[in-house]
């Protein structure tokens, strides 16, 4: 786990496309942690299944989060919990769009907790404009 003086959180997602809901969750995480890594999933087998390439999504997110000094954007192609461990993150922060997300996220939380019990997993519901794209 990271040192207490550099609290790192990972905000994983597809971000295809980026929404104001994504930026709301990222912004709130940036207020709570010293460093927030926005982790854009880049799975080669999903090529052609996303609206934008991973490189485009990284560029869009980098531009959208530019005012947040403690946010950086990276791609990943491993399990989220493995990526968080590699970055020495103390937390994984994800958004909840609707109640239907809860069951899936609950199951993922159980699996992640078994693999990395020292990493906190937080869920945040978006305040407004959840599905409106940037």
What is the role of each PLM region?
Residues 1-132:
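Nucleotidyltransferase catalytic core that binds NTPs
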């Amino acid at each position: 786990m990271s040192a207490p003086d550099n609290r790192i959180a990972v905000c994983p997602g597809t971000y295809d496309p980026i929404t104001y809901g994504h930026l709301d969750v990222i912004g709130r995480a940036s207020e709570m942690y010293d460093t927030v890594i926005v982790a854009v999933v880049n799975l080669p087998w999903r090529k052609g299944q996303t609206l934008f390439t991973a490189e485009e999504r990284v560029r869009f997110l980098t531009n959208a989060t530019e005012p947040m000094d403690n946010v950086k954007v990276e791609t990943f192609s491993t399990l989220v919990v493995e990526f968080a461990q590699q970055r020495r993150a103390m937390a994984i922060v994800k958004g909840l769009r609707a109640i239907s997300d809860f069951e899936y996220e609950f199951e993922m939380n159980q699996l992640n907790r078994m693999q990395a019990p020292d990493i906190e997993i937080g869920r945040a519901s978006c305040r407004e404009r959840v599905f409106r794209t940037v």
